């Protein structure tokens, strides 16, 4: 898979693709860096540049944001390298697939979310039943 994105977010398509044990060439920027390491995938260098004013979209792409621009020559060299040494990159891809299946399984993600909630969500007080004393008020008579 080749993904030269300017800003992927978490990069779920890349994570899912890593599970099929095929080589990945991707931008060395954004959320995919959490699970695509330099030893087992090919990360293409580049630079952050401010978002062009014509790309600004209210509440989506805000002024002052930056995009990652991969270097074309790095991307071309990466593609040639994988083609030339495909067997080596296929072995690395299998290792990456195993690593990501282990570290990003449903159980691991559930455990990580549990830790985040435990560490950052306050313990809310439980509602208790009020035990008020009975008031012995005089009985009122109805007036016609």
Which residues does each PLM region occupy?
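Active-site helix-initiating loop/hinge in glycosyltransferases
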Residues: 9-11, 28, 105
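Short alpha-helical segment that forms part of, or immediately flanks, the ligand-binding pocket
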Residues: 15-23, 30-34
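Aromatic "clamp/platform" in nucleotide-sugar-dependent glycosyltransferases that forms part
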Residues: 4-6
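Short hydrophobic beta-strand element within catalytic cores of glycosyltransferases
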Residues: 23-26, 42-43
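C-terminal amphipathic helix plus adjacent low-complexity
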Residues: 53-144
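Active-site donor-binding loop signature of nucleotide-sugar glycosyltransferases
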Residues: 44-48
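Short glycine/proline-enriched, acidic/aromatic patches that form the donor-sugar handling elements
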Residues: 10, 30-35, 49-57
